[in-house]
């Protein structure tokens, strides 16, 4: 076995141990399933952790109504194929207000449809622990977050008051209304994720693979025209370009990257040469300085 396979096996074992710990320790856990590559790895690990039994907690997708069409199709296919319990939540207040990233802006859209929607769903079902696919290498505020991330009864995160984590010992004590966000992939990198997907044969949305797609360049970001709701500016033209996505979210807020990588080995090769963050295409990360940390303090993923 190669050195890197051993490294991946160590990461796999750590993540599985965290999942089993949460399943044993908490009364009502849930896995946040956002349909991307990290969620796909989380799902695969959960199936391994509890095999041959069924995953002992539901998966939940907070749907903003603006996800890529392929993401929704892939989500439903995975739920049918693997038979897991799937909860889909859309913020009814946001739907009633017809919140849109085009008319209301990325910050308000994210706050109402993602953050508020997530908090609504967690409260409605009384979940005391929620798995997420965040990794420390993604973004600076996530780099300092614990594996067990304590949230108060308003789902707020206090980065200055985090619990110590010694080795693999985690403190899951919560009072009524409080909860823990759990990040089993904290120590994985983007390259680890792609190599694991390749070695384990994990299914992912084809949006991650390069092909010709209709895109518009807006403020330096390539936005894919995924449906008829996208308004075009007077000076904008839709062009077919060879692009793929390094991260997935709401299509108006997720930039594509020009790429020729059409297979997993080609993506891995691209990762070895890449010098930019995968979240460079996330419009919401550029709302203001420290915007991700502010969102997490308010209850974001």
UniProtKB/Swiss-Prot annotation:
Pfam families: PAPS_reduct (PF01507). With CysN forms the ATP sulfurylase (ATPS) that catalyzes the adenylation of sulfate producing adenosine 5'-phosphosulfate (APS) and diphosphate, the first enzymatic step in sulfur assimilation pathway. APS synthesis involves the formation of a high-energy phosphoric-sulfuric acid anhydride bond driven by GTP hydrolysis by CysN coupled to ATP hydrolysis by CysD. It comes from the Bacteria. One of its GO terms (biological process) is sulfate assimilation. Keywords: ATP-binding, Nucleotide-binding, Nucleotidyltransferase, Transferase. This is Sulfate adenylyltransferase subunit 2. Gene3D superfamilies: HUPs.
């Amino acid at each position: 076995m190669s050195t890197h396979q051993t490294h991946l096996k160590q990461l796999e074992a750590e993540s599985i141990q965290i999942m089993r710990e949460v399943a044993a320790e908490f009364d009502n856990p849930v896995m946040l399933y956002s349909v991307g590559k990290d969620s796909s790895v989380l799902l695969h690990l959960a199936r391994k952790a509890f095999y041959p039994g069924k995953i002992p907690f539901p998966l939940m997708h907070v749907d903003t109504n603006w996800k890529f069409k392929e993401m929704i199709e892939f989500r439903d296919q995975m739920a049918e194929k693997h038979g897991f319990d799937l909860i889909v939540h859309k913020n009814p207040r946001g739907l009633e207000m017809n919140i849109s990233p085009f008319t209301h802006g990325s910050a308000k859209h994210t706050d109402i449809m993602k953050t508020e929607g997530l908090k609504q769903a967690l409260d409605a079902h009384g979940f005391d622990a929620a798995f997420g696919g965040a990794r420390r290498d993604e973004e600076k505020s996530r780099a300092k977050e614990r594996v067990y991330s304590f949230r108060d009864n308003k789902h707020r995160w206090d980065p200055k008051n985090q619990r110590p984590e010694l080795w693999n010992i985690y403190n899951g004590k919560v009072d009524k209304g409080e909860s823990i966000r759990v990040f089993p992939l904290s120590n994985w990198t983007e390259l680890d994720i792609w190599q694991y997907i390749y070695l384990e044969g994990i299914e992912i949305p084809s949006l991650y693979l390069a092909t010709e797609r209709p895109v518009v360049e807006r403020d330096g970001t390539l936005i894919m025209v995924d449906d008829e709701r996208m308004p075009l500016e007077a000076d904008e033209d839709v062009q077919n370009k060879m692009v793929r996505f390094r991260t997935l979210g709401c299509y108006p807020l997720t930039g594509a990257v020009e790429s020729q990588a059409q297979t997993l080995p080609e993506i891995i090769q691209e990762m070895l040469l890449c010098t930019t963050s995968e979240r460079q295409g996330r419009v919401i990360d550029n709302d203001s300085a420290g915007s991700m940390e502010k969102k997490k303090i308010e209850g974001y993923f």
